[in-house]
Amino acid sequence: MAELAKSAVLVSSCTDDLLGDAKQVVVGPNQEDLHSAEAVLNRYSTVGFQASNLARAFSICEMMLTPQSPSPSLMPTEGDQASESPVMVQPTLFVGVTANLFGTGCREAIRFLCTECVPLPNGVEPATPLDDMAGISCDGTGALKPSPCDSRALIHVLVVSGGAMEHDIRRACESYKLSRDGAEEEGEQFHHPVERDRSRSKGTDCHFGNVRYNSSGVASRNLFSCVMRCLVKRLAEAQRKEKANREAAPIPEAYYDVCSWAITPSTLWYMAGLWMADIFTEALQETGEVTDEKVASEEGLKRAKSTVLYWAARNGVPIFSPSLTDGDIMEFILTAGDTGVPLLQLDLVADIHRLNRLAMRSRRTGMMILGGGVVKHHVCNANLMRNGADYAVFLNNAQEFDGSDAGARPGEAVSWGKLRLDSTAVKVYSEVTIVFPLIVVHVFVAWVRMMRSKGKENIRS
């Protein structure tokens, strides 16, 4: 018994082979590094704890921007005719974002990712061939069009939860404000339900965390409500035209889709992006904020350009919203019927098929998930359809002890097949607003500058 206890307690330290990659010495920024924020970030890999995980996220995001060969399972086998020179592809980058983050400064960082376009280097192909899925298609009469899925931006697919794009639009209508701390400002605590009800009836600000914005109902004549009503009205009219076109066309031999004119969330937000400048112009005049038509047009374009929607539509970034019905837009869709506007027919399933197909057709993929829940699950599940993503960066502060989707670590995604066995992934335990802007400026902004600098050098030579 004594020998058994001795052998259990006095175990030799593990060898270097068992330590794996645990060979870096822990060291922080030196005195010179402390004079530069960039130098400090460059030292994060050896700081330890979540700083080292953030440094790993930097590295993985750089990999996702780097042209490389397709995933091994998708490369030609011995029986196939392999090309003389291997194909190089730009990984398809799926980004999942929870709605609340669009109410924070992360929105501007996401807009940057949808706005900046850098041409692919010579000989490099997009990881995903052009989307040839049959969808809603119409002539130039103002009817519906599916989002093109041919992104020229830094990211290629954006998946959001319900309410995200409403925050995007609302912030182009009005400013969100920061409260001093947490949920309530000093002196604004409502200890009685009646006081809360009275406050809400007077239009007290809504809040999430320490972010506040003005609450308004569907019938309100403020700018946001006017924009949303105008959007729903345009969508209903476009759907009416699409339905008429479909009814007038001959019935195909294989007639499976009896509601082919239904609108998917990705189509809805794509059309919103295309119309955004005109909708703002119309709403500004309707509310009386601007009376001069030219000034309204200029202001409408300015506000449209401040949105993620505008740039995503302009640069071919599809926006999928699996939980669209959880957002503010549903209130405007449902109440539009009271004014004689036909209720929109929505199809959420077609978008799931399309999202999954985009992943399946991608020759190499990466995921960057901000938060958890529905966006994380749908992006990961889409990549499951291709035997897993090649890269992943998860940013959230959820724990795995309760089996939640948000709390799951990369190893759990590997067990499901959502990450490849040879994938490179990291989870950074942090509140997203702290680390995401750092990733954008340290990796994506730096990459854009580097590529444009190379482009100028090529022009000179």
Swiss-Prot record:
The keyword Transferase applies. The keyword Lipid metabolism does not apply. Its cofactor is NAD(+). The binding sites for NAD(+) are contained in the regulatory subunit DHSp. GO terms for molecular function: deoxyhypusine synthase activity; protein homodimerization activity. Disruption phenotype: RNAi-mediated knockdown causes cell growth arrest followed by death, loss of DHSp expression and a failure to sustain infection in mice. SUPFAM superfamilies: DHS-like NAD/FAD-binding domain (SSF52467). The active site is at residue 418. It is a single-pass membrane protein. It is found in: Membrane. It comes from the Eukaryota. It catalyses: [eIF5A protein]-L-lysine + spermidine = [eIF5A protein]-deoxyhypusine + propane-1,3-diamine. The chain crosses the membrane at residues 428-448. One of its GO terms (cellular component) is catalytic complex. Keywords: Hypusine biosynthesis, Membrane, NAD, Signal-anchor, Transferase, Transmembrane, Transmembrane helix. Belongs to the deoxyhypusine synthase family. Heterotetramer formed by a homodimer of the non-catalytic regulatory subunit DHSp and a homodimer of the catalytic subunit DHSc where DHSc appears to bind spermidine and DHSp appears to bind NAD(+). In association with the non-catalytic regulatory subunit DHSp, catalyzes the NAD-dependent oxidative cleavage of spermidine and the subsequent transfer of the butylamine moiety of spermidine to the epsilon-amino group of a specific lysine residue of the eIF5A precursor protein to form the intermediate deoxyhypusine residue. Regulates protein levels of its regulatory subunit DHSp. Required for cell growth and survival. This is Deoxyhypusine synthase. The gene is DHSc.
